[in-house]
């Protein structure tokens, strides 16, 4: 029965992807019906804010994005610092420590949601609403806006206006879908209230304080926007965030909704629907491989306990919620790191070595399917690399969407693809070479190394999940992960927007018999091979020293 439920869940991922992709294309490219519904409200916003609807250059678009995001980071930082004296604080929670406020503000603006605090006692209701929930809408709207400009550039069209795209992302995508999802979560038992703590009497007569709050609205945008931060410290393992299997499946669907839809949006916008389908199918195969790997490892149980003759019918159940089981916990871990969300319904630190390797690899690749917008930018980056390598092998100038891929584009892509591992491995080396980093490690040996690398991988990939055995709420970890999140977020977005702008100016080369097609299964295979060879092998030495060595030791 459990496998039937898994297959149905997978089919739901597939079935909603194309319709959502079509909707996104209409929402951003102009639809009379949508303009009639949302247009008046958007015009009012533009009038109040002074936004003028004109086409921007890529530099203007990028500058608008960075300045708006930077302003939001500063505002939310002071909300966190001053929450102790601000209203909507029934639990009398004090203001955040400076480096923690710095880390948290960047974390949520970068769509990472890395949390070095516990939601129950770290934030007031005002901070949860104005700080966290606000950024949970703004962060994915930023990248969804940018990816639309990116695709327009690839299609040879004007990039558009950041503020217009940002507003449309909010009004036409995130607000309506999150609102409907929140209502469903309330129906499934997720609380939604501004009332304070409830004092309950337990069976043995003791008193227990139970925190509640505006959880349903928080969870809906947390998953839809690939944010992932938890209202509670236990994240989606907490019964108030994720009461049962129905809410669990809905959360996974929301996480996958936009990342899986974007290949179809791309196909329609560039006039090559088949290429969009090829990208979707290729990535789904990689996703499926990851799920099979982690599930097999978790169902086989812990090798040490197996050697003692302990029964493991349910597999490795350490750190997992009984109401979800091993299989759905494995699926959730695959989804949350493939879609770069970071929400967890099981503790990733307790996964088996190979089970923990899958989420780590998903974040290192940052492209299967990746987070809202940012992930798709990486997908096209790998697609262009695949075309470039194929062109070199047959002695032809590489072409993508009829545009020649030349030195300028490849230099930008080379810098971008090297920057991600440089952030992860460079900061991991820094942490491991100083007591400020090593004193936070709770496990010695191979697993301790994985804890450190996982933290920086999660930060660079804007995922936010963690091997929570790491004592990371210190100035060193707050500052370094904050820098990694900021750089990992904005560097690749800006450089790839420059690539799209460069391709926009090029003339389309007529297709000939010798043109390498990017809309067939051959390209799909080369695309997957490029992801594995260029992406995964970059991190292979570290994976050998971490989870693979731990697996061999336990075995």
Swiss-Prot record:
InterPro entries: KdpA (IPR004623). The keyword Transmembrane applies. Coiled coil: none annotated. It comes from the Bacteria. GO terms for cellular component: plasma membrane. Keywords: Cell membrane, Ion transport, Membrane, Potassium, Potassium transport, Transmembrane, Transmembrane helix, Transport. Belongs to the KdpA family. Part of the high-affinity ATP-driven potassium transport (or Kdp) system, which catalyzes the hydrolysis of ATP coupled with the electrogenic transport of potassium into the cytoplasm. This subunit binds the extracellular potassium ions and delivers the ions to the membrane domain of KdpB through an intramembrane tunnel. PANTHER family: POTASSIUM-TRANSPORTING ATPASE A CHAIN, POTASSIUM-TRANSPORTING ATPASE POTASSIUM-BINDING SUBUNIT. This is Potassium-transporting ATPase potassium-binding subunit. It comes from Bacillus cereus (strain ATCC 10987 / NRS 248). The gene is kdpA.
